[in-house]
């Protein structure tokens, strides 16, 4: 039996120096879960054109919201040849009935516990329409099959995970809808063992946990275990790490090079709307300074388009980023992803006008904002992108970062270029608001499923 695992092209795919910015962790993990007697290959359309005529007995396709239309097109092409297709990932989980129109099987949730059964059921010629993965225990996970990727086609930043879930419940984020709010952790010794298997030619490891300091006692144990590994790593954390000096010092000693931190909004009203309560009591500028003093750079995430945002939000956001010298700003437009509280509210208010999933890349306006027009939000975002990602602005940020990163600052130039490229794509987009019902697909909400059909 031969299984093809397909990563569809992402509309925001960026290449630099002939390489894709980062590889996906999803398909190497699914490949590792495939029964060992089954031949498996990974096809990443972001690095090479996809041959839709390849022989296969089963095709598995993962999809996020922005590349869901492409995933559906690929699925339709393989099904037209009589090959069973499985759709899985965040987007199919949150709109399973929509995904089922393009697949023989839809996997809801995480793959552990169900993927081997899917493969065996297809091998027997008898399968279910839907398989629901439970929240698996993270002990004993197999090592991702990085050997199935041509790693020369990606930047040398492998991904790994130490935990899943997020204790926060931001209204615009689909993470909790997919992984849940209950944090689950891998044994620290297994994380360290996986690091030892990685090709040491990498420049840094990206730890994909949504909040690596979600449980401080676990984070301390993890950071202590990373110190002897002598690696450089990048992770995601809540801003609360700035106020735990012991934990912050340990992160720096363990090789933390940068932290992606969700500031989301500069206004208390915006934070309340996002349900980011933890940020409401923190002094952003003091927290940033504390992190910088440890030699850790910040990838700062900001969202524009909340109901309390007016056209002044763009200048205020730019001025804050410039004043605090955040090394890598990541500014996005509020986007009503499926499975989120935000989407349910905007649908109920009749404010979503764009139902083309390929536009849901967080650089394009898809709804009617409260205090400005869609055109004003898009144009303001475009101005903000031009200001933050001009070459002089990038150089100024990185020159400042030299004071606490030293020569390590060189690694942040390509990342800034990635966001510059993404912003340039958005500059060509012009929103075309229509009636909020026009073009609306029949199925836009997750619905309860009976999975034993």
Q: For the regions a protein language model found, what residue spans apply to each?
A:
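Acidic, low-complexity intrinsically disordered segments
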Residues: 1-200
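Radical SAM enzyme core and accessory elements
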Residues: 2-5, 39-42, 150-152, 341, ...
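Flexible glycine/acidic-rich beta-alpha junction loops that bind and position SAM and/or redox cofactors
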Residues: 12-13, 96-98, 217, 269-274, ...
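Alpha-helical structural signal in soluble globular domains
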Residues: 33, 37, 77, 81, ...
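Short, electropositive alpha-helical surface patch
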Residues: 51, 56-65, 220-226, 310-326, ...
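Structural detector of well-ordered beta-strand residues that form the stable sheet scaffold
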Residues: 86-87, 107, 130-131, 234-236, ...
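Structural recognition of alpha->loop->beta junctions
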Residues: 98-116, 199, 250-260, 316-331
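Radical SAM [4Fe-4S] cluster-binding motif and immediate context
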Residues: 143-299, 306, 311-319
């Amino acid at each position: 039996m031969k299984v093809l695992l397909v990563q569809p092209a992402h509309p925001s795919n960026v290449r630099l120096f002939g390489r894709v910015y980062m590889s996906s962790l999803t398909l190497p993990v699914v490949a590792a879960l495939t029964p060992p007697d089954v031949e498996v290959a990974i096809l990443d359309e972001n690095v090479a054109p996809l041959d839709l005529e390849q022989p296969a007995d089963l095709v598995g396709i993962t999809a996020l919201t922005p590349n869901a239309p492409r995933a559906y097109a690929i699925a339709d092409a393989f099904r037209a040849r009589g090959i069973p297709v499985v759709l899985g990932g965040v987007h199919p989980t949150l709109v399973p009935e929509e995904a089922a129109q393009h697949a023989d099987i839809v996997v809801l949730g995480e793959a552990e516990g169900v993927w081997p059964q899917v493969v065996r059921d297809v091998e027997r010629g008898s399968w279910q329409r839907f398989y629901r993965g439970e929240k698996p225990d993270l002990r004993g996970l197999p090592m991702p099959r990085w050997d199935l990727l041509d790693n020369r086609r990606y930047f040398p930043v492998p991904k790994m995970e130490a935990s899943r879930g997020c204790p926060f419940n931001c209204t615009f984020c689909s993470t909790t809808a997919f992984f849940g709010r209950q944090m689950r952790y891998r044994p620290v010794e297994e994380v360290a063992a996986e690091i030892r298997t990685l090709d040491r030619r990498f420049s840094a490891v990206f730890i994909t946990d949504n909040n690596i300091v979600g449980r401080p006692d676990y984070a301390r144990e993890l950071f202590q275990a990373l110190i002897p590994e002598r690696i450089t790593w990048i992770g995601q954390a809540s801003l609360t790490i700035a106020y735990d000096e012991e934990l912050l010092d340990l992160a720096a000693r363990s090789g933390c090079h940068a932290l992606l931190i969700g500031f989301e909004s500069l206004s208390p009203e915006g934070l309340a709307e996002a349900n980011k309560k933890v940020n409401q009591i923190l002094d952003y500028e003091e927290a940033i300074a504390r992190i910088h003093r440890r030699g850790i750079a910040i990838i700062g995430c900001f969202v524009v388009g909340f109901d309390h945002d007016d056209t002044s939000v763009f200048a205020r956001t730019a001025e804050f980023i410039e004043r605090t010298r955040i090394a890598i700003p990541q500014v996005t437009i509020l986007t009503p992803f499926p499975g989120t509280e935000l989407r349910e509210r905007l649908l109920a208010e009749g404010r979503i006008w764009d139902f083309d999933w390929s536009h849901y890349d967080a650089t394009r306006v898809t709804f009617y904002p409260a205090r400005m027009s869609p055109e004003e939000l898009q144009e303001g975002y475009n101005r903000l992108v031009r200001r933050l990602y001009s070459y002089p602005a990038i150089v100024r940020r990185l020159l400042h970062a030299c004071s606490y990163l030293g020569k390590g600052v060189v690694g942040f130039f390509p990342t800034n270029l990635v966001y510059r490229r993404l912003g340039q794509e958005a500059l060509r987009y012009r929103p075309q608001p229509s009636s909020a019902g026009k073009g609306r697909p029949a199925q836009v909400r997750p619905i309860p499923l009976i999975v034993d059909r």
